[in-house]
Amino acid sequence: MRRLSSISTFLIFAAFTLTAAIYEPSIESNDEVCVFFEADATVTGAPNIWVWEGNTDGRNYVGTTWPGPAMTYMGDTPSGNKIYKWTYTGTLTMPTGLIFTWNNQSGRMDGSFTNHGYYVMGQLTKIIGAGECSFVPNQNVIYQLDLYNFTSQGTLAAAQARLDYLKDLGIDIIWLMPIHPRGIQGRIGSLGSPYAPRDYHAVNSDFGTLADLKAFVTAAHQRGMRVWLDWVANHTAKDNVWITEHRDYYNSTLTSPNGYGDVYQLDYSKEATQLAMIEAMQYWIDQADIDGYRCDYISSNTIPTSFWTRAITALKEYKPGKTITMLGEGDMANSVPRLLNCGWDYDYAWNFQSALVNNKNNPSGVLTQCRNLVGDLRFIDISRMVYLTNHDQNYNSTMTNQYGNNAYAFTVLTFTLYGMPLLYNGQETGYLLSRKLDYFNRTPINWNTVDNKMLNTVKALTTLKHSCDALIDNGERATEVTFLNTGNSNLMAYTRHHNNQTALVLLNLGSSTVNTTVSGLEAGEWKLAIDVENIDAGLTATPVNLSSTQSFSLPAGGYKVYYKGEPYSDQKLGDVDMDGEISVGDLSALIDILLTASVDSSMIARADINHDGEISIGDVGALIDLLLSAHKGQTMLMFRP
């Protein structure tokens, strides 16, 4: 990444202003930040913006989505180039940089820096809320929220008041369990089942109003979090409004799937049913600006695969500039491979969770299942949600019953092995270790009951998940997982590597202290990030020297996480001489590296400009392009209120 001084930034902004041929950008109010991007006429598709917020010294950038309306096409320049405008109203306090990039055909971000239009850093006067940059699979932590039990009030407004708590916890996506009115006919419990929807176009009055939902989503977006709605497509409540208004959406003989006495099966052989369901899902994108769906029971044989392909395509294309992501309740790698190519972004690592329960006292079996989870990636081209509990699991059993003393170590496992970890409604506080939440009745969480060991562990894990490149998975499965020889079947050890960072995870899954030697490590200085015996300290960065064959001692159910190497985002791509900026001096330093043929991993992070995995003459050309791009006159305009 290139860094520009405040003076040079100002001069470049001034130069951009002079070259904006037709449009005279103006600030409409003192609370507005406008960004203009001029795209070459040959470029097709819609541009996207990545916003990077740094800390006070301008390092450790955190990506975030642009927290304002989608880009607006303003028109063409005399040369035929296209002008796009973004507007943001909010507050900004930290140094902020902007990267423009283009979606590739799959809709995911093109992560190659050589394809970014421009990067600039400036001391703006407003804050852009923290979060991750655009949609990156598995870089997210998801939180399943049951409104009835999340707060004592059981409302959207009360949940909104706790959004800062979720943000501080490190949550990226909030999955709201079904918000619709629940069926009355055949009702289960005092509340009825959330998965027996009575009206797809209404908000349960117990939770609040449509305005309350809009306010919740807006407040979440302001904090850099996304909101998913839980969606039941297979069936409706027996007293759903469609029963009287659209009886033709159902089977000719009303049937209850799986013996559920409170719902009727929909008939997806009918075009009208499919169109109505898609319209209902689009409704909430329109009305509440939601960001996606967790779809219930997608493995149902009564819903054709073609419907999911059709629906997901329609949802993702519905609102230009809006990213919609989809989680399907099914294990597509093992159980429902027919759904793999429908457009899902995530599935459930369902078999993995079941295997952890079945092997809670069998460390060798856990290792086998971990290998299977990583191996499943050969057969699946979407990302996976990894979890220990959810509404189905916790309704029937506590985490201690399911996992015993390994509930803590398995929590570390779900955050560090692979995929997007899920936290369910108070799980982070340890509340679910010994308690079950009944989603058919009110059983509000007591937030004063906290297991500090679990809470400190989860907070450390969410922070590490977002900051350690080795723990970030992407669509190309770039993170390498290597299982190590521990000399003791109770101790599981593995490393993950990506870019310039390596993480080492140690888990004692046995019932007694383990003293053993782990081989195959990269010798040198590591940082001890998470230590069960010092978990009150939370996430640390204690320097520790490890040898290639290192002795470790862990208590029963214990865990340690180490890492080495700087995050890739701290490596200042192109800043080869490490002076904090990109200049001609970096070109000289790059040539010196090529001449001496002396390359280490930290150099790769700074000097592999063209991202081909090595330092070569091609990087010289790419660096020259970077240097020249800092002086192009028609790239971007930014104005400061």
Where are these regions (language model features)?
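Active-site-proximal helices and loops of the catalytic beta/alpha 8
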Residues: 24, 33, 96-99, 118-122, ...
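C-terminal beta-strand-rich structural cap/linker in extracellular carbohydrate-active enzymes
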Residues: 90, 543-569
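Substrate-binding/active-site clefts of carbohydrate-active enzymes
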Residues: 133-157, 161-289, 303, 310-319, ...
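Cellulosome-associated attachment modules in secreted, modular CAZymes
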Residues: 567-641
